[in-house]
């Protein structure tokens, strides 16, 4: 049998906009004008920038823009392309949209890297497809994705906790970390006042104790650093994420801050040192996409980058609303029992509803109460991770998510009722310290506003969408 001559590589369209016309399997007849504006701006002004941020409002086709840029660079430069999402559910959603609606070949990477199929690994290593995975798959000690040409960060407004957690060692007072917490507390006793040490090591449950947050002065960290390293080395254990985090931080304790509360000790640098994480830093380009990008340097602080090129918001979109929301504040005039009765009545009228809570304790309480209502099904984070089809197909259902601002979207008739239950402003001890102890909440105003904007927008995903929001 004769050897076949390999065919020449197909020519790549000149721009991402031109690529859209070549996607013969797409179901969308054309790009929106706003999408075209962003793509042309990127091609003209940001093609060779190492860090690029683009902002598109909810419902304006941000995912398609990101996938077109990713697919175009994959074809044009034969680059391995990584598309990052905050959650597993969003990974599945993006891959489904890419393959079924946009005509872009995409591959989902979920679970342990040892579970990736040979075909999937080849798709990344040979730049055969757009590879979609979670933030956590890139930000770990030994990621599989170590040679990306381009990394696209979807929902970049939530990137901070996923990125900073890679260099954050959280020691909990209860559970498996109890012995380590006690040992570290004994070391910190030398540099803490008696009242602070009592709060840290005691079992105080008063509201004042629960609000307490503090930081060990940097000069004091220097004085106990060697003893602290020795104690943690002995007590950290041989398994679990704490050991891996300590491996990254151990030789850089003097560059870290130590934050304290009655339930947790957090050791981390103020800004995540992403320049030391080669799978992130060595990419030719990093693209950050969000519906809410601030101008105060918050994105740079979250990602550890000194400079990020921001593309202009498309003309005509700067002040456009994202659907209609009818806000209800029942606690202004009703007591606790009446609020619960109102909530149950609205759930009964709406059929499907979404509840966002501040923590797992509040979420479990809501789930318990809803299960007492006749004919209702409850869906938590795990139930929605693989997809939202079961929830959407139910006539009477409630989705309950704890401290979740992103990743779960319910456009149109999928859900018209949203409950926002006391969402917390701070998501970690560092944020709490700056807001509550230092009075520097101004630093986080954009971040807090972004979280609240994302929270109330879970059920209004387009200009013609609408929902009732109960706060």
Each model region followed by its residue ranges:
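Conserved Walker A/P-loop ATP-binding site and its immediately adjacent core
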Residues: 60-102, 106-113, 136-137, 292-299, ...
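Conserved coupling segment at the C-terminus of the helicase ATP-binding
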Residues: 47, 51-53, 57, 148-149, ...
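Conserved RecA-like P-loop NTPase helicase motor core
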Residues: 390-471
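Conserved pre-motif I regulatory segment
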Residues: 2-55
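Conserved RecA-like ASCE ATPase "motif II neighborhood" in helicase/translocase motors
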Residues: 117-152, 158-166, 267-273, 399-408
